Amino acid sequence: MLRLYHSALSPFCRKVRLCLAEKRLEAELVEEKYWEKSSDFARRNPAGKVPILRIEGKALTESMAICEYLEDLHPDPELIPKAPEERYEVRRLVGWFDDKFHQEVTSKLLYERVIKKISGQGFPDSKNVKEGARSIKFHISYMEWLLERRRWLAGEDMSLADFAAAAHFSALDYISDVDWTRSHVVKDWYAKIKSRPAFRSILADQVSGFPPPLHYNDLDF
């Protein structure tokens, strides 16, 4: 069986988990306290990051590289299109959420509100929290613009771009940091994607000391 070293609220780990589940690949989940920087963890990935996927004796790192590896091995269902323009758009949007959105929103809200506390790094920086809360409004507007022109974020079919975005939004939704009233279009998109069977384990996540809001695992929120 595959083994995934992960952190429950990490959007990068969630993206890989969604990819695995959508392709019906079973994996043992091993919670990794990456901030403790244990010697075993350092041997698994000297970069000191999760996720790490153990497969056929190899330790795969970097979430996008893992997802592309899984796509090559298990192309059905397709999450990264083969047509160059469509493939580009999926990769562009995965990059958007994993780089720009993470830097401007997820890292400021999730890190400050949760990671700092569970890793013993002190109290939230209110300036960062305010910046993250302000920045997410722009990103929701951009997503609304995309979704008014397409069925899914990158085109007419659901793709890894949707999973990348949903991985970030689900982590933020766990800590009640998404104002779903800002866009019914984005809310409908999220309700649609969280209803997929691949999302079940994500919605079952529990982080000690941080209970999710009641709507977190409600498919009709």
Regions found by a protein language model. Name each.
Residues M1-K130, D220:
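GST-like domain detector, emphasizing the conserved glutathione-binding G-site
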Residues Q206-F221:
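Acidic/histidine-enriched, glycine/proline-rich intrinsically disordered or flexible terminal extensions
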